[in-house]
Amino acid sequence: MKKFVSLLVMVSFLISFSGCSALQPKNDGSISAGFYPVTLTDHAGREVIIEEEPQRLVSCYYITTSLLMALDLDGKLVGIENDPELRPIYELSNPELLELSWVGTAKTLDLEACAALEPDLVILPLRLKDSAVILEDLGMDVLLVNPESQDLLTEMIQMVAKACNRESTAEALLGFLSEKEAYLRAALADVDAPSVYLSGNSNFLSTAGNDMYQADMIRLAGGRNVAGEITETYWADISYEQLLAWNPDYIILASSAKYTVEDVLNDPNLVNCSAVVNGNVFKIPADAESWDSPVPGSILGALWLANILHPDLLTDTNCTEIMDEYYETFYQFTYSKN
C-alpha cells in the first residue's frame, strides 16, 4: 500500500474528478494453510479477492461496526463512523472504540480520513459504491453490503466472516440467531397477527414498506405490517389519512425516533386511531443498540416486539434471558445490568 502522503494526494486527485492507531485484536484467529486468497461476491455483485488476512479494518456504518464486534474483530478496527458516542453498545462492549478516528457516515465517506488510516479492508454500505472505486484504485480491498432482508443480513455475516477468517465465529452467531428465530416461530405459530404501524426516526409519517428489513422484524414478531403494500426500499412518506385508513392495532416508534410516545398519544390527528385509543403505542428500546436496524442483534427487536404483541406467549423473563445470553456471548456484557 502506498505511503500516507501518497494516499492523501491520490485521494484528493480522484475526488476532484469524481465528485488513529489500531486497537490490539482480542483474537487474531488461526490462518489455515491455503486459506488465503479468498474470492467473494459482495452485494453490488462485484468480485473481491482478499489476498491475505486483513489486520486493519474500517467501517463507516454502525451496522457493520456492530457485526465486526460480534465476530470478535473490533480489535482490528482503525476507523469507524462519526459520532460513535451515540451508540451505547460501544461503551458497554469496548470503550476503546470511542477513541478511533472517524471516517464519515453511511451516506458520506471521508475519503481522505479513510485512506490516511491505511486499512487493509473497508466495509461500506451499497450506496457508497462510488467511493469503493476510489479506494480500490488506491490499493484497498472494499466490500459493499446491503443487509435489507434477513437473507441479505445472513449473507453479509458470512461474507465479512470469510474475508476476515472468522467463519467459525460466524457459524456460532448464525446458529444462535437461527435457534431464536425458530423459538419465535414455534411460540407464535397459531397466533392472530395484529396490525402494526412502524414509524420512522425523523418523521412519524414515514414508514417501512414490505421490502425493508423492518418488515421482516414485524412478521417474525407475529404482526402484520400495515404498510406491506409499499414496495419502496427506503422509508416512505404517508399522510394522516392513509394511517387512519390503515387504523393499526399497534403503533411502534423506531428506536431513534426524534419524538415520543406521548407526542403520538396526544396528537389530535390520531384521536380515532385504534392504537391510540387503546394505548398501544410503544418505542423500540435503544439502551444497547438499534434492534430495528439490520444488525445481528435485530433478532432481539423481533423478540421485544413479540412480547408487546403477544405478552401471554412471551414473558419479560424469557426475553431478558435471551438478551443476556446474546450479549454475554458475542459482546461480553450483560444487557440486564446496563
Regions found by a protein language model. Name each.
Residues 1-5:
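Positively charged n-region of N-terminal signal peptides that target proteins for export
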Residues 17-29:
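Bacterial lipoprotein signal-peptidase II cleavage site
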Residues 59-117, 121-127, 226:
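A short, structured surface patch at a secondary-structure boundary
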Residues 128-137, 254-268:
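A ligand-binding cleft/hinge motif common to bilobed small-molecule-binding domains
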Residues 207-235, 239:
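Alpha-helical, coiled-coil/dimerization segments enriched in small aliphatic residues
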Residues 103-106, 110-124, 140, 239-256:
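Proline-aspartate-enriched helix->loop->beta-strand connector
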Residues 32, 37, 47-49, 130-206, ...:
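Extracytoplasmic substrate-binding proteins
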Residues 8-16:
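Bacterial N-terminal signal peptides
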